[in-house]
C-alpha cells in the first residue's frame, strides 16, 4: 500500500513534466512550420517517405489538438495553473525538505551508534 501512496504523491510532478513537454512540443512545431522542404533527391529515400507519411497522418491530429487546447496556452491560464501548482505542492517544499533531512540524519546517527559497540568497541561481555 505504501508503494501506491508514493506513486500518488509523484503524480503532480509527473503531470507538470507532461505539461512542460507539451508546451515545448507546441512551441517547436510552430517553429518548424516555416522550414523549407528537403531537396527532391532526399524526398525519394525510404525514410523520407515514411517521415512524410507520418507527418501527413499526424499533422491533422496535432492541429486539432493545438486548436482545442489553445485556451490553455494563453499566458494568463498557464500562469494561473503554475501559481496553483506552486501553492499546492511547492510552497512548503523547503521546510518539508529540512524536516526530512533532520529526520534522516537522526535515523542514520541512531543506526551508527547502535552498530558502534559491535564493530568498533566489541562486546563488553567478551572482555
UniProtKB/Swiss-Prot annotation:
Subcellular location per UniProt equals: Secreted
Q: Which GO terms describe its cellular component?
A: high-density lipoprotein particle; very-low-density lipoprotein particle
Per the UniProt entry, the signal peptide is 1-27
The family database entries (Pfam families) matched by this protein are listed as:
APOC4
Q: Has the keyword Secreted been applied to this entry?
A: yes
Task: State whether keyword Transport applies.
Answer: yes
Q: Which GO BP terms sit in this record?
A: lipid transport; positive regulation of triglyceride storage; triglyceride homeostasis
**Where does this protein chiefly localize?**
secreted
- List the keywords (alphabetical): Lipid transport, Secreted, Signal, Transport
What task does this protein carry out? May participate in lipoprotein metabolism.
Q: Which family does it belong to?
A: Belongs to the apolipoprotein C4 family.
* Protein name, as recorded: Apolipoprotein C-IV
Q: Which organism is it from?
A: Papio hamadryas (Hamadryas baboon)
Name of the coding gene: APOC4
Amino acid at each position: 500500500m505504501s508503494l501506491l501512496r508514493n506513486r500518488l504523491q509523484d503524480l503532480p510532478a509527473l503531470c507538470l513534466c507532461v505539461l512542460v513537454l507539451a508546451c515545448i512540443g507546441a512551441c517547436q512545431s510552430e517553429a518548424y512550420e516555416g522550414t523549407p522542404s528537403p531537396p527532391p533527391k532526399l524526398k525519394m529515400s525510404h525514410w523520407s517517405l515514411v517521415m512524410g507519411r507520418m507527418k501527413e497522418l499526424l499533422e491533422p491530429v496535432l492541429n486539432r489538438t493545438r486548436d482545442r487546447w489553445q485556451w490553455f496556452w494563453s499566458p494568463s491560464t498557464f500562469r494561473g495553473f503554475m501559481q496553483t501548482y506552486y501553492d499546492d505542492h511547492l510552497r512548503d517544499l523547503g521546510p518539508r525538505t529540512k524536516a526530512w533531512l533532520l529526520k534522516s540524519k537522526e535515523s542514520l546517527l541512531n543506526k551508527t551508534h547502535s552498530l558502534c559497540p559491535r564493530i568498533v568497541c566489541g562486546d563488553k561481555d567478551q572482555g
